[in-house]
Amino acid sequence: MRTLWIMAVLLLGVEGGLWQFENMIMKVAKKSGILSYSAYGCYCGWGGRGTPKDATDRCCFVHDCCYGKVTGCNPKLGKYTYISENGDIICGGDGPCKEVCECDRAAAICFRDNLDTYDRKTYWKYPASNCQEDSEPC
């Protein structure tokens, strides 16, 4: 399911939402969000359940929680403005999608700050069956 969703985003050439998040991750963490975080642990990628497996997976858990609090903008499709300055991201505008930008900004910084915990060998394409326990509250 994750792979199908990722391919759809790429084929459609989406300019907002998730595509902007991908670009933001590239600028801040110097990694591809699609190739590095779209199917990682219990929370990075489509859906999420259970206990985050490491600090990187926790970045995705917090990002999911942040998206859950957004009102007035579809986080996966809404377009926002931002600039990259000196390795940091500054979200612009006052529209409803600025909240999404701030969620994405925090996650990109979290990925960068936790690159040392990223464990592709263990958590890439981690089986959902290992993420069945109840999720902690946001």
From Swiss-Prot:
Amino acids binding Ca(2+): Y43, G45, G47, D64
Tissue note: Expressed by the venom gland.
Active site: H63, D104
Compartments in which it is found: Secreted
Signal peptide, first to last residue: 1-16
Enzyme Commission identifier(s): 3.1.1.4
Top EC group: hydrolase
CDD domains in alphabetical order: PLA2c
PANTHER family per the UniProt record, alphabetical: PHOSPHOLIPASE A2 FAMILY MEMBER, PHOSPHOLIPASE A2, MEMBRANE ASSOCIATED
Protein name in UniProt: Acidic phospholipase A2 PePLA2
